[in-house]
Amino acid sequence: MELKVLFSEDPAFVLSRAGHFLSSQPVHHNLILSTLHARVAHAEQGRYWMAIQRADIVGVVLQSPLTFPATLTPMEPTVATAMADAIAEAGIALPGVNGEAAAAARFAGQWSERTKSAAIPFEGNRLYELLQTAEVPAVEGKLRQALPKERSLMILWSRAFQQEIGESADGTELRVDRGMAAGQLWVWEQSAEVVSMAISREPVQGVVRLSGVYTPREKRKHGYAAACVHALSKKLREGGYRCILYTDLGNPTSNSIYRRVGYGAVSEALRYRFK
């Protein structure tokens, strides 16, 4: 059966063509769905590929911003191979790939063979979904949205977070401004001091992804991040949303925190760097 790879730079077209496929698994496809919706709302350069078999979409890969690694949906090995081949044949130099473990591994392996570059796995992630809002030890303070006067602090913390997870901090100010305008930046306040932050991404198909959970080093080991995530997750769940987040498998502390809050593992993902 013939497998075609269709390229586009138009996120609206990709949503119109692949929307049904992506919405069929809103948790597994959330990262790509939310990125596409964001690019439609706020124009930013991007590259998008759709794998088509018998007129059906069977996989999607995107790269946006263009300095970022590619992100892919879960897909069959043959589809991941075809995607890597098509992108390599187009002469596009990807810095890396992120995605569901098996698909990312197959893509990275094929990319390495086709481009004669090294594919280095450097981080394992786990996708979690909130199954229940478990009770956690009480922590003094409260959850609230970040205030305009805290913009500089949110930018500082967001850059520090990106640095800690090994991602580019390009565009941080713009993302913070958009997040604050949309009411998506949240903080944990204790005794009139902001001690932790978290981001709730735009809801897509009833799913909200939490990200950017950060506490400065001098404020860690007090339970602030757990309290912030617990309160935010509970608030979103009570609003009828499903909550998800990704964690670094190299950080057992954060994984245990999220399990205590009520999150359960869904799947694993891998991040590769190409050199």
Roles of regions detected by a PLM:
Residues 77-86, 211, 215-217, 221-237, ...:
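Conserved acetyl-CoA-binding loop-helix of GNAT-fold acetyltransferases
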Residues 54-55, 62-67, 133, 156-211:
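Acetyl-CoA-dependent GNAT
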Residues 187-190, 200-203, 222-235, 242, ...:
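Recognition helices and adjacent regulatory flanks at domain boundaries
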Residues 98-104, 245-256, 271-275:
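Conserved beta-strand-loop-alpha-helix junction that forms the acyl-donor binding cleft
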Residues 1-31, 133-167:
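Short amphipathic alpha-helix that is part of the acyltransferase structural core
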Residues 3-9, 20-26, 33-92, 96, ...:
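Conserved donor-binding loop and adjoining core beta-sheet/short helix segment
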Residues 53-57, 62-140, 272:
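Acyl-donor-binding surface of acyltransferase catalytic domains
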Residues 28-37, 98, 166-174:
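A short, aromatic/hydrophobic, helix- or strand-capping loop or linear motif
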